Amino acid sequence: INNGFIRNSHNVLTVSDRDIIHNNKSIKDISGRSTLQNKIIETFKNFKPDIIILGHADRVKKSTLEKMREINNSTKFSQWFLDPLSKHGPDHINNTNRILDKIDLLDSTFLTTDPSALSV
């Protein structure tokens, strides 16, 4: 996805929630998750994106997305998801919960599974 945006002359900033958490664990923030939320919000303020696309960003809290919406309500939020969501796929309950977790805060969702498999 990033490569497609870059090839179409868009400025892309990739943020890895896992890397930020891994590199920022401390006594004050044992899990690194608080630091992640703060870094995302500060980056959002500085970068001023037109769109945020989440891919397997399970560690990004809903409250962080809500704060970003408060800062700039015109930014579009989307997510993409490649893992299977059908009942017969591996770990379908967990995958379905992951895709639905932030769906009320998003403008769009891109799936590789037929959306009817979500039973929403």
Q: Predicted segment positions?
A:
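Extended catalytic core of nucleotide-activated donor transferases of GT-like folds
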Residues: 1-120
